């Protein structure tokens, strides 16, 4: 009987080890995410989040006044050892200013992070798959010619999204899920 149960559960257990998914929406993972705007530096950009039944909606307006220029949606700090994965799949839709996926390895704002730009979707749902090692290193918004290293995937402590164009305008970004595989 025990052998039979193990055989039945084995495919499920393997699937759990081969994928890690952050699913958004009411009563799901969206409540662990918060908005951080450029107001932390004196800027006047605005952003807000709203949980829907199956997604998280992040929208706002980027302002360049007072040296502003960004709005971000971030998961609370946690350990994300994603070193067993090669790809990230994201289902989202967006309009307005484009956004980027970000990974942080430090709580300090001035320590370089990693990001990759996401294509706009004209408000149509899109599912993309990106190679994790294609994320690039950035230092305070400036690209450093270095890709994310496989060993750094053990050090990720925050996942997020940030407006990716330093220009005035509205944006809307709705995300269904992030899946590491």
PLM features: residue spans?
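Beta-rich carbohydrate-recognition modules and glycan-binding surfaces
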Residues: 14-181
């Amino acid at each position: 009987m025990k052998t039979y149960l193990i055989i039945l559960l084995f495919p499920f257990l393997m699937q759990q080890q081969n994928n890690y998914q952050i699913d958004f929406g009411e009563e799901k993972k969206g409540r662990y995410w918060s908005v951080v705007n450029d107001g932390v530096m004196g800027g006047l950009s605005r952003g807000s989040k709203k949980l829907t039944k199956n997604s998280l909606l992040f929208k706002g307006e980027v302002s360049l006044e007072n040296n502003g220029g960004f709005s971000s949606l971030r998961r609370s700090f946690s350990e994300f050892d994603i070193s067993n994965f090669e790809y990230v799949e994201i289902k989202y839709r967006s309009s307005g200013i484009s956004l980027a996926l970000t990974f942080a390895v430090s709580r300090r704002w001035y320590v370089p992070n990693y990001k990759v730009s996401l294509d706009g979707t004209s408000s149509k749902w899109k599912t993309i798959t990106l190679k994790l090692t294609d994320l690039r290193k950035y230092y305070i918004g400036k690209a450093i010619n270095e890709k994310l290293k496989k060993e750094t995937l053990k050090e990720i402590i925050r996942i997020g999204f940030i407006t990716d164009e330093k220009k005035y305008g509205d944006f809307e970004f709705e995300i269904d899920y992030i899946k590491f595989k």
